[in-house]
Amino acid sequence: MDKYDGSRVFFREMCKNNRDDFPYRRGVIMSELHTPCCPVVCKLILPDPLTIDFISKIQQKPFLCIQFCSVLPCLEILEEFDRRSKNDKSLRRFVDYEGATTLLTFNELFNKYSRIEGNQFVFHVDSDKYLLNEHTSKKIIDLINPSISIIPTLSLKHSERKKWSARKRTKLNDLYQTYYETLSRYPNSTKLVKPIHPCIELKEMGDFEVIEFPGFGFGESLNERYEWIKEMGKNLTGKEVRIIQLKTGTPLEILHAVLMGFDVVISPYPESLSEQGFALSFELPSEFEGNYEPEYVLNLLNERCKFFDGVYKDQIKDIVDLKNSVHIDVVESLMDEKSVRKESRAYINHLLNCKEMNGNIILSSHNLYMYELLFQRIRDSIENDTLVNFVYNFIQLNVKRD
């Protein structure tokens, strides 16, 4: 692995793979956030029901992903607080992300995509209708002051490439240009994330320090995803922070994204599993047998991760259904021996079946911790130049056996 002392301030590479087709690397964002990494996706404006303090016990540097649609219902309150706090410095902050790196995303990670009316995006939150235009986007960024913010634009799913009409392509590009020009015109400490898409003209857009690959996670195979990502990234310098947002974001999707060179992988999977009563439980290899080529391992990932009923599902043992009655008497087994949570499977089963909110809170913290463990092992294997073998052995160690 090549070593770098790093001359860039925002993102510093620590080591990287030499192969152009698989540009995975270890790095640091803003001298604190170690990559590759996965932020905690907030369904609301706050990481409720978990607190920043608790997340800091899971992640060395709390990293939160906040959605535009979750901020919109609170916009009037945020504006009122901002107005009053200028005259009263003793007011308790309405939203406090102190100590955390924050990423503001346009994608609705738990719902269907928004509709468009003119140049405005239409969201429906709890049966209420909210509109987002470029000026509202600017207002939200000013009030929230996120570390990083993805520029809103129309989403065209790569799984529907054949259906992209010239009108849709033009609409996506025009929307992006409008929002980009508005958001980049004003001074702000927020680093703007620019999407890379076949329909977006990127001329005269300056130096890309952070980029996003939108439109993935909607039914394309992992092999198709690989080919399209390679096509979209062929003109990049390799110095940019790469972000991908996945609609499912399973462990095998995570490993695939890291092999493809992504530094930040946004996945709602830990939270989605928690809502359904599922706990992540997988083995992490400590020894890596063999010497495998990336192409072979990518094909293996493609075979083991399939799209069913609107979501991706890994064909490995990685989750446990704690609502299942088989866990009623399992009082000595934890959700996973590696977990930060020490409650038994029987206790969680009881909480879930009684519809106690604490059951989902415990599951949420457990699942987030399991993903943090996975990413830590990914970072270690990149430093040791064993990532490809780690991915292969992870699959083999967790394969379902009849």
From Swiss-Prot:
Pfam family membership, one: TGT
Glycosyltransferase found in the keyword field: yes
Keywords: Glycosyltransferase, Transferase
Presence of keyword DNA damage: no
BP term (GO), one: tRNA-guanine transglycosylation
Domain of life: Eukaryota
InterPro entries per the UniProt record, alphabetical: Queuine_tRNA-ribosyltrfase, TGT-like_sf, tRNA_ribo_trans-like
Family: Belongs to the queuine tRNA-ribosyltransferase family.
PANTHER family recorded: QUEUINE TRNA-RIBOSYLTRANSFERASE ACCESSORY SUBUNIT 2
Full protein name: Queuine tRNA-ribosyltransferase-like protein
